Amino acid sequence: MSENKGDGGKLLYCSFCGKSQHEVRKLIAGPSVYVCDECVELCNDIIREEIKEISPKQDQDKLPTPHELRAHLDDYVIGQDKAKKVLSVAVYNHYKRLKNASPKDGVELGKSNILLIGPTGSGKTLLAETLARFLNVPFTMADATTLTEAGYVGEDVENIIQKLLQKCDYDVEKAQRGIVYIDEIDKISRKSDNPSITRDVSGEGVQQALLKLIEGTVAAVPPQGGRKHPQQEFLQVDTSKILFVCGGAFAGLEKVIEQRSHVGTGIGFGAEVKGEADKATISDTLLQVEPEDLVKFGLIPEFIGRLPVLATLAELDDAALIQILSEPKNAITKQFAALFEMEDVELEFREDALKAIALKAQTRKTGARGLRSIVEGILLDIMYDLPSTDDVVKVVVDESVVKGESTPILIYATNEAQTATAE
């Protein structure tokens, strides 16, 4: 930087930090005052922090109604109407309870933790994540299969709270308004109906460990992800304010329900499904689930009692998968179209291509979860070549591309110009 000086060659200094014009990149002059670029940046940081502190308080005053929550879910999640309604009411009641922590009549409101039952790829995680994003609250996921009781090899249940804190930069107040989704909860079912002499540290033991956390306790978490140490000060997190959503496929649960209600079908999510009638039967059977069925499946009564809100999700059919590919705000085809648009290229999926992708996902039995990997595979080669290819203005994917019988159709600017001239 050249040695610029003020009037009369006098060296100028920042009126706030005292640094000279040679120690900073820019010095802005005002009436009898100067401010450097570093002080301006510091002021911006302070203002941003203050806005962050104010925003959550403003958000707390504007609790969306169940209708508004449901409408937002409709924008991102296809189908599952009953589950959406159940979730919208439960989430609304949970945050209404936090907002009115001290009811005038002294009635203590219980927690509305949620249990979601449905096959892989039916939208359990997406529902919880979409609500958290809409409500602007921290969200974290945990896999129940990795959890063990404290003192055993594996992940301690309190690590879930640590992950939630990490999502909000260890702001305890924000974390206490967060949502935790615990997946594969059916995998920690009790291994047998009878208590075993051998300790079940990854099944019933984990259920016992999760009980207090889900119901509400003050969890002691090391700050900034440090290891637990006797002399270390812990962050105290009240989990009674955190909404817990547990989800699982519960393969075979319909057989337990059928035994109770004497309905003789007995086909599970894990088994081969042979027809639309069978699929409907499974979904209808799961709608009849009672707490006693979950106990027989392997969840302990105390654990079920901590999850009072129950919602079942149906297996997605071809029509739903096609909708998921193209209709939601963040639909997979829209995401890839946005990527191609960054290369100034239009991406088009023909209707027969969408049907073929849905059929492939059904064959793999991955539900909506497998759609992205299928589309990634279809577009891999073209995404590799496109940045090095000139003049391409449009890429078209049809059924033959999905089946691997041909490559995507490329339309070049010269072709379009020739077509326009011919017309």
Curated annotation (Swiss-Prot):
The keyword DNA-binding belongs to this UniProt entry's keyword annotation: no
Species annotation: Shewanella piezotolerans (strain WP3 / JCM 13877)
SMART domains, alphabetized: AAA, ClpB_D2-small, zf-C4_ClpX
Family under the similarity heading: Belongs to the ClpX chaperone family.
Binding of ATP, residues: P119, T120, G121, S122, G123, K124, T125, L126
Record-linked InterPro entries: AAA+_ATPase, ATP-dep_Clp_protease_ClpX, ATPase_AAA_core, Clp_ATPase_C, Clp_protease_ATP-bd_su_ClpX, ClpX_bact, P-loop_NTPase, Znf_CppX_C4
BP GO annotations: cell division; proteolysis involved in protein catabolic process
Keyword Transmembrane helix attached: no
Limits of the ClpX-type ZB domain: 2-55
Quaternary assembly: Component of the ClpX-ClpP complex. Forms a hexameric ring that, in the presence of ATP, binds to fourteen ClpP subunits assembled into a disk-like structure with a central cavity, resembling the structure of eukaryotic proteasomes.
High-level lineage: Bacteria, Pseudomonadati, Pseudomonadota, Gammaproteobacteria, Alteromonadales
Binding site for Zn(2+): C14, C17, C36, C39
Known role: ATP-dependent specificity component of the Clp protease. It directs the protease to specific substrates. Can perform chaperone functions in the absence of ClpP.
Record-level Gene Ontology MF annotations: ATP binding; ATP hydrolysis activity; ATP-dependent protein folding chaperone; protein dimerization activity; unfolded protein binding; zinc ion binding
Listed name of the protein: ATP-dependent Clp protease ATP-binding subunit ClpX
GO cellular component terms, A-Z: HslUV protease complex
Keywords: ATP-binding, Chaperone, Metal-binding, Nucleotide-binding, Zinc
Annotated Pfam families: AAA_2, ClpB_D2-small, zf-C4_ClpX
